[in-house]
Curated annotation (Swiss-Prot):
Superkingdom to which the source organism belongs: Bacteria
Cellular component aspect of the GO annotation: plasma membrane
Source species taxonomy: Bacteria, Bacillati, Bacillota, Bacilli, Bacillales
One annotated GO molecular function: metallopeptidase activity
Gene expressing this chain: yugP
Name of the protein described by the UniProt record: Putative membrane protease YugP
């Protein structure tokens, strides 16, 4: 019962975090940065400063679809960020470039996350089926196998946390030192990036509590046998 309550609480945190990301992004999308740079210009400048001239910056459709692709080595920014001159645009653009800088120096957590992604992607798809099959058939072996596979997905989300926090830290340091934001604009940057980081924390908690719930089901079933 406790784990169910914790999972519900984590889900609530996840929904709240998503709301905060969208609301803060929209709020500071309306506040133009004093530097007058677009998100694309900000990203390009930071990449060039760090010698990453061969890493392109491309627009991508959607909102909050921004990401760095380590396979193709490209920074993709949603159109509101790519073309925007707001505090939100500069914050998100610099965060994604932070991942490119991590890649440049072979930041351990990023490299590990990239290497295990194919395995985790497979495990995430199969684990729920094993849990369902195990509970319907009363098979502890299937549940146990599901736990092993789901553990990989939880591990992936946990190592995502330092990757995202580090990228945000790099982003704030660079845009302040280079003068992309000034004075009280830093407060807006902190709110945009902190809300985004919270979504990863919430997702990790949801996965962790789900894993613990299935571990308890497995242990209780074993005791009954």
């Amino acid at each position: 019962m406790l784990f169910i309550f914790l999972t519900i609480a984590a889900l609530g945190l996840s929904f709240w975090a998503q709301f905060k990301v969208k609301s803060n992004f929209e709020k500071y999308s309306k506040v133009e940065a004093s530097s007058g740079r677009t998100g694309a210009e900000t990203a390009r400048r930071i990449l060039d400063i760090n010698g990453l001239y061969d890493v392109p910056v491309e627009p991508v459709r959607g909102t909050l679809t921004d990401h760095y692709d380590p396979t193709r080595r490209v920074v993709r920014l949603s159109e509101p960020v790519y073309y925007g001159r707001s505090i939100s645009a500069i914050s998100v653009a610099s965060h994604e470039v932070g991942h490119a800088l991590q890649h440049q120096e072979s930041y351990g957590a990023l490299v590990l996350r990239h290497k295990i992604f194919p395995v985790v992607n497979f495990a995430s798809g199969v684990a729920p089926l094993l849990f369902l099959g195990g509970m319907l058939l009363g098979s502890l072996n299937l549940i146990g196998l599901g736990i092993i596979l789901f553990s990989a997905a939880v591990f992936f989300q946990l190592i995502t946390l330092p990757v995202e926090f580090n990228a945000s830290s790099r982003a704030k340091q660079i845009i302040v030192s280079e003068g992309f934001i000034r004075n009280n604009e830093e407060n807006g940057v902190n709110k945009v990036l902190s809300a985004a980081a919270l979504t990863y924390v919430a997702a990790a908690l949801v996965s962790l509590f789900e894993l613990l719930r299935f571990v308890m089901i497995f242990l209780n079933g074993r005791d009954e046998n």
